[in-house]
Amino acid sequence: MNSDRIIKKYPNRRLYDTEVSRYITLADVRNLVMDCTSFKVVDTANESDITRSILLQIMLEEETGGEPLFSASMLAQIIRFYGGTLQGMFARYLESSLDLFAKQQQDMTKTLGDNPFEAMTRMTQKNVEIWADMQEEF
């Protein structure tokens, strides 16, 4: 059984979330991504999977709306991999690197809590206490 949430894209460019039975925006789709909700976007005209296309639209909005994640140089380098002999390897490398980075970020958040500065401050204070105790012993 496929557990992906189905979002239908109609010829009028509107997106319809079949799980909540209402039209949604790209911002709503972005929220699904941020909530790690698995979904698939299907073009109703030909039943093709257009999930990647919708995700790229969201990335484009993010890149033009605020602090860009990708520099022009980085984008140019990525484009150069298209059609090359290393395209598949590069795609797997990027995906593996992002997976590792996300796991490390999750582990760090779990270890340090929601406020890493507070955790670092506590750690520093504890180290100062240990040093003070050691100095008193000598």
UniProtKB/Swiss-Prot annotation:
Signal peptide: none annotated. Disulfide bonds: none annotated. One of its GO terms (biological process) is regulation of DNA-templated transcription. InterPro entries: PHA_DNA-bd_N, PHA_reg_PhaR, PHB_accumulat. Pfam families: PHB_acc, PHB_acc_N. NCBIfam families: PHA_reg_PhaR. This is Uncharacterized protein in phbA 5'region.
